[in-house]
Structures are given as C-alpha cells and as structure tokens.
C-alpha cells in the first residue's frame, strides 16, 4: 500500500507496519529533556510520523521548536507533520500538515503545500471519509476510539467504522484517541495502518517515553 493516491506524497506500507506509531507531541514543549526523549523514541524505529501539535503557542515559538524537531525527524527518517497550520508547515518545509474539520479547506491547503502530505480528521463519519477520498488526501484519521486525556472527546468511533472505511478506500487510516498498551493491538488487527499516540508516551506515570514505546510490539 502507498500513503498517497493520485498525486499525494507516498509512504510504503506493510500489512502490519513495523513503524505503526503516528506520534503526537505533548501539549507543551519546554526544556531539553523532551528533545532527548524524542531522539530515543524515534530511534526505536516504531514511528512513521511525528505531529507537532501545540495549541497555545506563538507562531514564532512554533517555528523555533519545529526547526529543532525537524532535524531529529530527518535523522530517524520520520515524517514531520504540523497540526492545523499549512502556512507554518510551508515555512518549516515540513513533510506535511494535518487538518481538522474546522481548519483550512483541503483544496486551499494543497495550493500552499503542493504535493506534501495532507491528512484529515474524519471523526466517526463515513460521509466525511468519502469527502476525504474525493479530496484525495494522503491519510484519513478516525476516532476517538477510546477516551483520551489529550483533548475532550466529542466523537466516539467504533471498530465498525474502521472496517467500513477500509472497505471503501485504500487511503491509509490513522486511528486516534486514548490508544495505549492495553488496547492498541485490537486496532492493528482491524487493519488500522497507523495509531496516533500521545499521552501514553509523554504522560505515562509508569514508564518513561522510551520504555513506553518499546512495550508496543
């Protein structure tokens, strides 16, 4: 499988990808400890994407943080994605951008980012999945499959919606929402291509980030 259809940037995929983690940043990034942890986590060779998602940060700080993260992602051959903001993604020359339903229009984002990766959140809606297919996105994010501490869950997704989406498209599916050690395998077995993970890695009270990701076999 390819990460792109009809002109969007591609990534090779296995039936169950060894690099199945779509890693999302913590809500705040301060100090050098995060960057040390990030190097170790990406070196695990389990991560395909890293998304920079900082909701309450200035553009200036986003660019400063993004430049540092981009170097680490490049070192470990991880695709660097910016959340919500195609303009920042372009300024950083990131690999792509992730868009929510209330963010910039996909076609407008494509004009800015050209052939870069553009993924979109479709919550639990097959109607939104079909629109994403028509818009020729790079990947489709579905969820939340489980409750999450990262953000309030407005849309609850089921394994059924994942199965239905897989039947109508070959565009890779990213499962999101509360994914951790106790529930991740069910999503992979139901053919989610990537798992978006954040709190389990960065806010785990039992394991440090490297140990947490190594637990995901």
Residue positions per predicted region:
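Glycine-rich phosphate-binding active-site loops on the catalytic face of alpha/beta enzymes
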Residues: 23, 99-109, 141-153, 178-216
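Catalytic cores of alpha/beta
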Residues: 41, 80-95, 124-137, 168-175, ...
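Catalytic domains of carbohydrate-active enzymes, especially glycoside hydrolases
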Residues: 38-53, 135
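Hydrophobic faces of well-ordered beta-strands that scaffold small-molecule active sites
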Residues: 19-25, 48-52, 80-82, 97-99, ...
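N-terminal active-site wall of soluble small-molecule enzyme domains
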Residues: 49-112
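Alpha-helix-loop-beta-strand connector modules within alpha/beta enzyme cores
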Residues: 63-82, 108-125, 154-181, 213-217
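Glycine/Thr-rich beta-alpha phosphate-binding loop at enzyme active sites
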Residues: 91-101, 120-167, 204-210
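N-terminal amphipathic alpha-helix/helix-capping segment at the start of soluble metabolic enzymes
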Residues: 1-37
């Amino acid at each position: 499988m390819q990460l792109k259809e009809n002109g969007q940037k591609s990534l090779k995929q296995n039936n169950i990808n060894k690099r199945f983690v779509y890693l999302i940043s913590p809500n705040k990034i301060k100090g050098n400890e995060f960057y040390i942890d990030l190097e170790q986590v990406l070196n695990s060779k389990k991560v395909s994407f890293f998304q920079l998602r900082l909701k309450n940060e200035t553009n200036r700080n986003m660019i400063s943080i993004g430049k540092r993260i981009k170097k680490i992602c490049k070192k470990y051959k991880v695709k660097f994605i910016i959340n919500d903001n195609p303009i920042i993604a372009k300024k950083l020359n990131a690999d792509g951008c992730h868009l929510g339903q209330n963010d910039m229009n996909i076609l407008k984002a494509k004009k800015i980012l050209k052939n870069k990766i553009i993924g979109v959140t479709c919550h639990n809606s097959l109607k939104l999945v079909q629109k994403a297919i028509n818009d020729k996105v790079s990947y489709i994010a579905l969820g939340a499959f489980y409750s999450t501490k990262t953000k309030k869950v407005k849309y609850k997704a089921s394994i059924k919606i994942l199965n239905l989406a897989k039947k109508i498209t070959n565009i890779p599916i990213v499962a999101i929402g509360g994914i951790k050690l106790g529930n991740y395998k069910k999503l992979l077995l139901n053919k989610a291509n990537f798992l978006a993970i954040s709190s389990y890695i960065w806010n785990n009270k039992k394991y440090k980030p490297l140990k947490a990701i190594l637990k995901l076999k």
